[in-house]
């Protein structure tokens, strides 16, 4: 249902990365991203967060007319609708070599997605995913400050949201996101989409955009 959207978003992320040079503005870079989606999808809808540098501490929004600099992070949280269905994924990028601290945070967030996937299973509840994801934060003295994902489908954000105390059952056959981010000295967020089956959650985006930090360095 969302394979076409995910492939197009993956290609658009890669086009932005490949076009990056210091001195280009955030607007110029986003134009590359959007033109790739236009070419691949034609008629589609999109909502997004596109935030650079200090703006990543705001969690959401759009950074306009900004010239990226070494040490910045970029959060691109992208929801795309095609043929009646929405995907909702997020990747974070680094301008120049990531610092040791940025690497540590990226790996923590990546692992929290892996833990959340274990809880996304038949018979589970929405709160189970938040608990699993947030456990990785607690181990590092942190807290996940927003939901840990939600259902997607004919809307980009549907109920249930994965929040503490949400007892809504998970439903086999539905599409869900797992979403995790930390926003302190810099912001980093990652989000993948999953199909829930009787045998567990199938990650629909990992093969397209593996979570290897070196793949997200802008040089």
Regions found by a protein language model. Name each.
Residues 1-219:
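Active-site neighborhoods and metal-handling regions in enzymes and metal-associated proteins
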